[in-house]
Amino acid sequence: MTSHPRDAPQFYLTAPSPCPYLPGQHERKVFTHLVGRRARDLNEILTQGGFRRSQTIAYRPACETCRACVSVRVVVGDFEPSASQRRVLKRNRDLVGQPQPNRPASEQYALFRRYLDARHGDGGMVDMTVLDYAMMVEDSHVETHLVVYRKRGPDTAINGRGVGAPIAVCLTDVLSDGLSMVYSFYEPSEADRSLGTFMILDHIERARLLGLPYLYLGYWVEGSRKMDYKAKFGPQERLMPQGWARVG
């Protein structure tokens, strides 16, 4: 009989379901639980191996006939923003991101709901309640925090805090070799700001200031318009069967 160490992770496989990225495809995921004293170390190892975190679950695609989902991470030390990305930074000079503990707030959920209703009305998260949101944010056994973006105020240069309602929010994991953007959302009425791009650019700079070599962006899916934007942040590394390979 095969025995397993008491704290060894157990992996499970989901049933097939429609792929949210490629029409006509079906997805399956392999997943394990991130709980207990080894959760942080396990999250490190699995993220570096192409997994993503959702609450206390780490998962990666395990589709039978498709390998389109590719883990990507930005090489922070070599990144230089493009002309269009510099324009995004300029448009958002009036914003400041403040790291804070992963505690949910009603103003965050209100923004989250507006974002889902405007951008992902047919997605799997559209029915999330305030309790679901709270669990997404605070149900974690790893090192994580929120970065909440607000407009700059008269005292921002002194205290680093913005004013007014949040305009964008990112749930961010801290790893030994980088930051991982777990989930982000933003004010849909501020589309001209390109807030999704701005948060990635801001997190690249945060990783740089922390001396971390990578920013993990999750999966890039060739042929999916939803994921095209991730290819614009280079140089980056993509996880291939032989390991991480540099692109750009």
Curated annotation (Swiss-Prot):
Its EC number is 2.3.2.29. One of its GO terms (cellular component) is cytoplasm. InterPro entries: Acyl_CoA_acyltransferase (IPR016181), Asp_Glu_LeuTrfase (IPR017138), N-end_Aminoacyl_Trfase (IPR030700), N-end_Aminoacyl_Trfase_C (IPR007472), N-end_Aminoacyl_Trfase_N (IPR007471). Keywords: Acyltransferase, Cytoplasm, Transferase. It holds the Pfam family ATE_N. GO terms for molecular function: arginyl-tRNA--protein transferase activity; leucyl-tRNA--protein transferase activity. One of its GO terms (biological process) is ubiquitin-dependent protein catabolic process via the N-end rule pathway. It is found in: Cytoplasm. Its main location: cytoplasm. Functions in the N-end rule pathway of protein degradation where it conjugates Leu from its aminoacyl-tRNA to the N-termini of proteins containing an N-terminal aspartate or glutamate. PANTHER family: ARGININE-TRNA-PROTEIN TRANSFERASE 1 (PTHR21367), ARGINYL-TRNA--PROTEIN TRANSFERASE 1 (PTHR21367:SF1). This is Aspartate/glutamate leucyltransferase. It comes from Methylobacterium sp. (strain 4-46). The gene is bpt.
